[in-house]
Structures are given as C-alpha cells and as structure tokens.
From Swiss-Prot:
Molecular-function GO term, any one: GTP binding
One Pfam family named in its UniProt record: Adenylsucc_synt
Subcellular location: Cytoplasm
Organism classification: Eukaryota, Fungi, Dikarya, Ascomycota, Saccharomycotina
Name of the featured protein: Adenylosuccinate synthetase
Catalytic activity annotation: IMP + L-aspartate + GTP = N(6)-(1,2-dicarboxyethyl)-AMP + GDP + phosphate + 2 H(+)
BP GO annotations: 'de novo' AMP biosynthetic process; IMP metabolic process
UniProt-annotated binding residues for GTP: 11-17, 39-41, 307, 333-335, 415-417
First-level EC class: ligase
Chain coiled-coil ranges: none
C-alpha cells in the first residue's frame, strides 16, 4: 500500500521533514510530478542534503527510489543533484530509478520560460516562475510534441536520429515564437548524445516497477511536490505550477489505482506563506508579516526569494482537504508563533457583504474578499525544547484543536523547530 505526503497550501510547508522521518521505515520512495522547481533540505548525521528533483528516500540506504512518469527531468540538473549528494558520502545510484515515460526539460525550455516571464512582466502579469523550464515542458507534453526519456535512451540504431528530429522541431517552433535567441542547440545535442548512455542504467518501466512493489507488499511513500493551491486545475490559476499537485497527480504520475492509497498526509504550515505572484487573502503587509518572515526564515530553497507571509487560512485548508481527502495532518513551524500574544485565523470569506460557501475560482473575486478572522490567545513561550505533545502549552493545544475541529481531520504530527527530532507525534 502507498502512503502519500502532500502540501496543503502554496508550498514550502515542510513536506521534506515529514518524508525524511517516514523514510526510515519504507521500501520505496516515489516522486510523481513537478521537476527541480521546488526544494528542501534534509540533515543526516550533521550533513545537509538539498533535494529538488530526486526523491528524499535516497537518504535511507535500504530504500529504492523512483522519479515517476509525471515528473519533468532536466538531465544536467539530475546529474548535478546526484553528484552533490554523492560527494557528501551518500552512494545511491543503484537505488535510483527514472520512468521511461517522464518528459525531458531542455535548456531552450528554460530560456523560453524566462522570455515568457519577461513578456508578462512588461504587462504586469508576471506569474513568478522559477525559470526552470517546467511550464514550457508541460506545454509541449500537452501539445503532444514533447520528448520523453525513452526517446533519448532507446538503443535502436534509428532512435538517435528520431530524437534529433523531434528536438529540432521543438527548437524551430520556439524560434518562430521568440525569434533567434542566444542558444547553441548543437552543443546541447552533443551533450545529450553522451547523456543517453549515462542515463540509460537508471531507466525503468515505472508502471511495472510500482505494481511489482505493490504486489510484493512493499511499504511505499509518495512524495508530493509543490502544493494543492499551486495545482494546474484547482489552484489559484494562472498563478500556479503546470502539473497536478494533488492526489490526482499521484495516481496519474505513477500509474497506480486509487485502491492502492492508504494514508494521505496533509502538511500544513502553522501560518501561511506564498512565493511569487498571485492572490493571498490572509497576507500581512505589516509587522506581523515581517515577524513571520524573520522568525520563520522564509526564503526559498530553490530561488532564494523572500516568501510572502500571513495568518493561517482555514478557508484554503478546507478547500484543500475536500480535494485531497487528508487522513491526518502534520502542522509545521508552530514555534514561529511563540511570541504572539494573539493569533488570528482566517475562517471565512465575504464578498460584497455575503459569506461565500466555497473557495472562489475567479481571481477578481478572490482579490476582493474580506477575510473573517477568529482571534485565539497565543502561548507566549518557547516550545522548541518540548518533546511530547502533552507538554505543549494549553493555548498551543487549543490552537491545534481549533484547526482539527474546523477541518474535521486529526493532527498526527506537530513541528516545533527545524531539527529532525523537533517533531511531536500525537496519538490519533
């Protein structure tokens, strides 16, 4: 059976830490969507490992790891990330697999990603993309002109010529759209001729791989990327990523049926953050937001950008819970709220004086909502040294209980600091 870890807000909730803890007792860790446009750090024996595209299960020497079909892969970044991990003493090549059906991100995807963003910026409609080429790659995938891993690694004598033909079609279509931009496609092709040999040992039929693991009753953990509010269908479109970041993306990205899913863990930051552009109803453009940013060290692992900060938004979380069906929650960074005398929580939206029954799909409406807040008392004490849930201050437990009751989902873990052991488990 499969357990799944998903982000419930706009990303950066701290999924990696929970995955790291759960990885101690699993046989397979799989990534199902996204690319190297997100990241997190795991500390093992004092060494920091930065993960962007590769599964976090690589830190467990007994765990097999899969980059699934729904992931888009920039091969140079794949090997760079692998090299950085190996240089710190983590030998994992024999435990890392790549789906033959995953699509490839090329350098020209990244160039056109930045050109597109520059165009949008001129019209003040910037998305806030990471510039990693993720959107353009999913675009070519959807238009059925993309290039998949099997196109690159196929050992048939005719395969390399077919790969070059597909590649040049993509380059030419970008040149028609953006003109002759500074890009050496011949040099990139030469690199990929070498990569095809280097990548081939990692490549598997991921459907066969996953279903063999399921049949053998292996313990499988699926590591979600980004978060529900960045989902291409259910997020704050168009300020979203280009893949399905919810539970649906797990099934389509790995080729597994719903009946194989056992637990769905929703990771929730104790307040709300967002990187880049897009609506953010509970954002605090004041000293509250600055405090959350400073105390929470809210800077992106991948981009280094400051994260926008605000109060916890239970309207967002209720919507996220409806779609993903969380079986339990991990509340992270509760300690960041330690110094607040009072803590506010968004519990409803009003538009033109009327309370909305559901999360608005239209950004004009979302930008004009009035947030209804519930004010809860803070605990005003350091909780970072606490090792048992029962020892948390009463007001901290009341804050968590309010979240549980509002969402109808039990909280199973509470993060009280950055260290791996700063995670309290609560009986459910």
């Amino acid at each position: 059976m499969c357990d799944v870890v998903l982000g419930s807000q706009w990303g950066d909730e701290g999924k990696g830490k929970l995955v790291d803890i759960l990885c101690d007792d699993i046989d397979v860790c799989a990534r199902c969507a996204g690319g190297n446009n997100a990241g997190h750090t795991i500390v093992v024996d004092g060494k920091k490992f930065d993960f962007h595209m590769l599964p976090s299960g690589l830190v467990n020497p007994k765990c097999q790891n899969l980059v699934g079909s729904g992931v888009v892969i920039h091969v140079p970044s794949f090997f760079e990330e692998l090299k950085n991990i190996e240089e710190k003493g983590l030998h994992c090549r024999d435990r890392l697999k790549v789906s033959s059906r995953a699509h490839l991100v090329f350098d020209f995807h990244q160039r056109t990603d930045k050109l597109k963003e520059a165009e949008l910026s001129e019209n003040k409609k910037s998305i806030g993309t990471t510039g990693k080429g993720i959107g353009p790659t999913y675009s070519t995938k959807a238009s059925r002109s993309g290039i998949r891993v099997h196109h690159l690694v196929n050992s048939n004598p005719e395969a390399w010529n077919e790969f070059k033909t597909r590649y040049m079609r993509l380059v030419e279509s970008r040149q028609k759209r953006y003109g002759e931009f500074d890009y050496d496609y011949e040099a990139e092709l030469a690199k990929y001729e070498k990569y095809r040999e280097e990548l081939r040992p990692f490549v598997v039929d991921s459907v066969e791989f996953m279903h063999e693991a399921i049949a053998q009753k292996k313990k499988i953990l699926v590591e979600g990327a980004n978060a529900l509010m960045l989902d291409i269908d259910f997020g704050t479109y168009p300020y979203v990523t280009s893949s399905s970041t919810g539970i649906g993306g797990v099934l389509t990205g790995l080729g597994i049926p719903p009946k194989t899913i056992r637990n769905i863990y929703g990771v929730v930051k104790a307040y709300t953050t967002r990187v880049g552009e897009g609506p953010f109803p509970t954002e605090q453009l004041n000293s509250v937001g600055e405090t959350l940013q400073d105390v929470g060290a809210e800077y992106g692992v991948t981009t280094g950008r400051k994260r926008r900060c605000g109060w916890l938004d239970l309207v967002v979380l209720k919507y996220s819970t409806l779609i993903n069906g969380y079986t339990s929650l991990n509340i992270t960074k509760l300690d960041v709220l330690d110094k607040f005398k009072e803590i506010q929580v968004g519990i409803a939206y009003k538009l033109n004086g009327k309370e909305l029954k559901s999360f608005p799909e239209d950004l004009i409406d979302l930008g004009n909502v009035e947030v209804v807040y519930k004010t809860l008392p803070g605990w005003e004490q350091d909780i970072t040294k606490i090792k048992k849930y029962e020892d948390l201050p009463e007001n901290a437990k009341n804050y968590l209980k309010y979240i549980e009751d509002f969402l109808g989902v039990p909280i199973q873990w509470v993060g009280t600091g950055p260290a791996r052991d700063s995670m309290l488990e609560k009986k459910i």
